[in-house]
């Protein structure tokens, strides 16, 4: 485990030494420490404990963990006895760390398919096995980073065209949930990547007719990824932002729509942008719990607003997040997390002299029954646009359906 200054680099894979280190996101924003991942088991535990999270990031970490696992096994074991069947079994085990996020499953199954195309299950893992896994994983990382910048540009284009069609001028705000930035991906991010790009390229100082003035990250209970991670990234980038509780979204939108100040800003909310852990064929989207709630809030305000004052609900994700095998959201398996994530809070004790070690504090009646789904499913009917790395953002046709296969 290593410590260093504030950073947004969630994944460090050294292509020369074949070593993998991940930023322990449970410690952010109060500490920056990296954990060494030397095996598939290490990755499973880190993903399960949410030391690394975000659908693209866990897929990349999962793939790289197979790389270092095979590399270390070949380097350290004199008598080679590990079979391809053993490796495939370990890969299937890795998938179970986070079942809702399709990216991890897709990456692992892609690797399995590539391996089984070249080897039989009773053959031994060898250097060629490593080469196959390495080449796939490096390409996965590089493609994800490139695609995230494309998502940012495509999201910017959709936002500009939307505001032009509404004849909107002046400052506007965006709401987001969970963490979808550099910490959740190879870099830049998806939903937060769009926010980064929009803030950089739509500037009042540059003479634009409209500009992003403020971002409102929802805290994202019960794991507080918005409060811990998204605020960390927004602060790092110098993007003006105000943290709100998940239950404040309706009041926030209503207050700003009446040109009343929230802190120092009156810029109305024009967009809600969320990421995705799984998008199925019809556009139904599984994302962090609370996303569905935000879409219904937007729908409520839109039903009472003039067309030029509506709020667009945007999903941002790479195409690797799309699951064409599942037709509707009813087929998505929703992961349930441990009850103590809801009944306790974990964090460092803060004093005038600095930060003390992390402690756990109870906040609910001992023994109370708990339902703690990690994700919910937003129906495609409530989504205005799905932004991927494809040039054209996906909007619904006249029948209200997405065609994601185009």
From Swiss-Prot:
Catalytic center residues: 277
UniProt GO cellular component terms: cytoplasm; nucleus
Name of a matching Pfam family: IF-2B
Top enzyme class: isomerase
A GO molecular-function descriptor: S-methyl-5-thioribose-1-phosphate isomerase activity
Recorded metabolic or biological pathway in which this protein acts: Amino-acid biosynthesis; L-methionine biosynthesis via salvage pathway; L-methionine from S-methyl-5-thio-alpha-D-ribose 1-phosphate: step 1/6
UniProt catalytic activity: 5-(methylsulfanyl)-alpha-D-ribose 1-phosphate = 5-(methylsulfanyl)-D-ribulose 1-phosphate
Site (Transition state stabilizer): 178
SUPFAM superfamilies registered for this protein in UniProt: NagB/RpiA/CoA transferase-like
Subcellular location: Cytoplasm; Nucleus
Record's keyword terms, sorted: Amino-acid biosynthesis, Cytoplasm, Isomerase, Methionine biosynthesis, Nucleus
EC numbers: 5.3.1.23
One BP annotation, GO: L-methionine salvage from methylthioadenosine
Record's function text: Catalyzes the interconversion of methylthioribose-1-phosphate (MTR-1-P) into methylthioribulose-1-phosphate (MTRu-1-P).
Record-stated family: Belongs to the eIF-2B alpha/beta/delta subunits family. MtnA subfamily.
Protein name: Methylthioribose-1-phosphate isomerase
Organism: Debaryomyces hansenii (strain ATCC 36239 / CBS 767 / BCRC 21394 / JCM 1990 / NBRC 0083 / IGC 2968)
């Amino acid at each position: 485990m290593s410590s260093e200054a504030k950073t947004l680099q969630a994944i460090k894979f050294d292509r020369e030494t074949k070593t993998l280190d991940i930023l322990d996101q449970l410690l952010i924003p109060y500490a920056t420490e990296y954990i060494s991942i030397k095996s598939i088991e290490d990755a499973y535990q880190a993903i399960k404990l949410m030391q690394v999270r975000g659908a693209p990031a866990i897929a990349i970490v999962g793939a790289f963990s197979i790389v270092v696992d095979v590399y270390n096994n070949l380097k350290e074991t004199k008598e080679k006895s590990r079979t391809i069947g053993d490796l495939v079994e370990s890969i299937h085990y890795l998938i179970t760390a986070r079942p809702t996020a399709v990216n991890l499953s897709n990456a692992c199954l892609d690797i399995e398919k590539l391996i089984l195309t070249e080897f039989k299950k009773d053959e031994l893992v060898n250097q060629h096995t490593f080469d196959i896994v390495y080449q796939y994983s490096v390409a996965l990382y590089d493609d994800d980073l490139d695609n995230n910048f494309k998502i940012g540009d495509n999201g910017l284009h959709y936002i500009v065209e939307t505001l032009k069609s509404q004849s909107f001028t002046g400052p506007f705000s965006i709401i987001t949930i969970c963490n979808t930035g550099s910490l959740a991906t190879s870099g830049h991010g998806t939903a937060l990547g769009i926010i980064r790009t929009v803030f950089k390229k739509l500037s009042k100082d540059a003479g634009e007719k409209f500009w992003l003035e403020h971002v409102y990250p929802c805290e994202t209970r019960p794991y507080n990824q918005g409060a811990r991670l998204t605020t960390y990234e927004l602060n790092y980038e110098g993007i003006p932002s105000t943290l709100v509780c998940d239950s404040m979204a309706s009041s926030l939108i209503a207050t700003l729509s009446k040109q009343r100040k929230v802190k120092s800003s009156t810029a109305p909310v024009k967009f809600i942008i969320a990421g995705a852990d799984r998008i199925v064929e019809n556009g139904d989207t599984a994302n962090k719990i609370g996303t569905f709630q935000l879409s219904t809030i937007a729908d409520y305000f839109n039903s009472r607003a003039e067309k030029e004052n509506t709020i667009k609900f945007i999903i941002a994700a790479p195409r690797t997040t799309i699951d064409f095998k599942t037709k509707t959201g009813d087929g998505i398996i929703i992961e349930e997390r441990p009850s103590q994530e809801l009944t306790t809070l974990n964090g460092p004790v803060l004093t005038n002299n600095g930060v003390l070690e992390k402690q756990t504090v109870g906040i609910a009646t001992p023994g109370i029954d708990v339902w703690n789904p990690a994700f919910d499913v937003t129906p495609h009917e409530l989504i205005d646009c799905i932004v991927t790395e494809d040039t054209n953002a996906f909007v619904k046709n006249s029948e209200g359906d997405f065609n994601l296969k185009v």
